Amino acid sequence: MDSNEARHSTAHYFLEGLNEIGFDYLFCNFGTDHAPLIEAMASFKRAGREMPATILCPHENTAVHMAAGYTIATGRGQGVMVHVDAGTANSAMALHNLCRARIPVLLMAGKAPFTTRGELLGTRDTYVHFVQEPFDQASVVRPYTKWEYNLPSGVIAKEALRRAHTVMESDPKGPVYLTFPRETLTDTWSEGQIRSYPAERFGAVSARGLDAGSIDAIATKLLAAERPLLISAYAGRNHATVAVLDELARFAGIRVVEFNPLYVNLPHDSPCHGGFMPAKALAEADVGLLVDVDVPWIPSDMPDNPATWWVHIDVDPEKRNFPMWTFPGNLRLQGDSHRILADLLAALKARADAGFKTRAAARVAALAEEGKARRDQAAKAATNRGVAGQINPHFLCATLAKALAPSDIVLNEAIRNGPVVSAQMPRTQAGTLVGLAGGGLGFSGGMALGLKLAMPERTVVQIVGDGTFYFSNPQSTLSVSRQYKLPVLTVVLDNSGWAAVKEATLRVYPDGEAKAGGDYGATLSPDMNFAMMAEAAGAHGELVSEPDAVEAAIARCLDAVRGGRSAVLHAKVTRL
């Protein structure tokens, strides 16, 4: 080792490593554990050196979901920094959502210093350093991560970062977790001791296509099918898949149902779009394709046909993070759905005869008629505007849809009003819808900000219930929106409670004591004014309870957002 070589802290090399793995942003909720990194960032800034830009988030839920939104928009995973065990705990719900959605994000947290009497730079120097050391910090998020690691020495800082990035970006993708004690970050190393790990030699593993025999087997089944059905939830994470799936469905006459969609998987105006509930089609299908879907239907409500032949095409067909998963699959195939569907379409085109094309065209025509009937039904539902103090959410969502462009992005976290959003606000372009993969409510606020950060030219609309609005840490999201000039429209469909809780109780105990007493433990305060919360953060706020006021209120909110200011439309809708 050359004694004249420059020496730098682990934190310095850590920032270099973050650059090398290609992070654009670090979404941060800093604490005492990050002092060496903050010092290194200041040094980089003074020297004019490149490093990821930092976005400060008052709550970790905002930070993690914001990173996820940016990742969805760009296809490049990002980094999040939080404070020791407490920040990790605040991040756990968001990590759950990212795990289920297979979104690659690197969550980084410090650990309490391990020296107590000044033995090393970075030693414990405040009360919290003694109380923020659990026996197993990573256990908080272990169920939701693909990989975890504690950095033992700065000499492998870049190696650890490359490993984290490789794991999170390898299919099936997902979040990873890295921790580091403060003394490790302050330790110094010469430049010659630190090695880089370039992506071209240490990069991620991507899902591939299928062998010709598997493609041929699926094609054979489809060529003979009379009532083919395809169910998907997240094939549209790759925008190119949407057009391929549409062409395949039209060519082969396949009904496509999106059950709990995370993205636009098929344009909602496609003649083959079969809506969002597969129940009727399940009973009739003779050939079924599950394509990138975790929960294709609810077996207790929608029994499948035991005679249906199923093929499951998925980046994760074994559902390795689901302790119990028993949906049928005569053929289970892991791979990239875009490549597989494109190969399947080519195989069908090569083998289809005139009779097949005639039958497929007839199915497409019949599906188109069914689609028109669904749209007519949705339009009829929207004609009921509601009454004073209880706006019909169908009417509100239909009115909002008319004010949006096809390229605008909708985040659907309306939960029990989610089907209303789906029915009244069809999205026809890839990348214009984001739904909830996990069970952690409150994802859409942070994700909306991340999407807006990545695509500032787009209008981003977050639709939530009042219960979900609380979960989304709105003070934090409104603060980030204001500080970083990321205007988003939030629509709160306020039914004064948790409809999901009430409905779940009635499903299990339809004639029980809760129903008799009318108490479901689900009623929230009806007197909140979320518009005032928005105004306190410098955003535009509207509280609307009269149907006649809806259209003008939406227009004012969109004018504010398109003028650079976030808006919250608090709408009093049909109560529980």
Where are these regions (language model features)?
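Conserved short loop/turn motifs at secondary-structure junctions
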Residues: 233-238, 384-385, 465-468
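Active-site diphosphate/adenylate-binding microenvironment
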Residues: 11-21, 29-41, 368-457
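N-terminal cationic-hydrophobic initiation segments that often serve targeting/anchoring roles
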Residues: 45, 71, 168, 249, ...
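Short, well-ordered beta-to-alpha junction loops that form the rim of enzyme active sites
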Residues: 179-183, 233-234, 413-417, 571-574
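Phosphate/pyrophosphate-binding active-site segments
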Residues: 1-5, 152-155, 307-414, 518, ...
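Thiamine diphosphate
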Residues: 116-131, 282-285, 325, 333-334, ...
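N-terminal alpha/beta PP-like core and its mobile active-site loop of ThDP/TPP-dependent enzymes
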Residues: 2-351, 406, 478, 487-490, ...
